């Protein structure tokens, strides 16, 4: 059985036992998070939500809170002596999917 959930403005296909990385969510390591925005549940019988499947939830456990590798952003304008270098590290949350309840 699998499901498609919406979190952090993205849609992610998940299965039980899978590890996923999502945009940072509030919670400590070991906390259980429940996703109510389930768009689709597949398996023996498929359920399509309009826009969400009623009564369907996905539970996940927080494994890690972290930050991605640094990206370097560099801007410049020719002939104007304008140079700007900036770094960015996107925060993320690593989750393990416990169960899909449909």
From Swiss-Prot:
Asked if Iron-sulfur is a keyword of the record, the answer is no
Q: Which domain of life is it from?
A: Bacteria
Asked if the Swiss-Prot or TrEMBL record annotates the protein with the keyword rRNA-binding, the reply is yes
**Which Pfam families does the record associate with it?**
Ribosomal_L21p (PF00829)
Look up the coiled coil feature and give its residue ranges.
Answer: none
Which InterPro entries does this UniProt record tie to the protein? bL21-like, bL21-like_sf, Ribosomal_bL21, Ribosomal_bL21_CS
Q: Name one GO molecular function term.
A: rRNA binding
Quote the cellular component terms of the Gene Ontology held in the record.
cytoplasm; ribonucleoprotein complex; ribosome
Keywords assigned: Ribonucleoprotein, Ribosomal protein, RNA-binding, rRNA-binding
Q: Name one GO biological process term.
A: translation
| Family the entry assigns | Belongs to the bacterial ribosomal protein bL21 family.
Name the job this protein performs.
This protein binds to 23S rRNA in the presence of protein L20.
UniProt subunit comment: Part of the 50S ribosomal subunit. Contacts protein L20.
Q: What is this protein called?
A: Large ribosomal subunit protein bL21
Q: Which organism is it from?
A: Listeria monocytogenes serotype 4b (strain CLIP80459)
Upper classification of the source organism reads: Bacteria, Bacillati, Bacillota, Bacilli, Bacillales
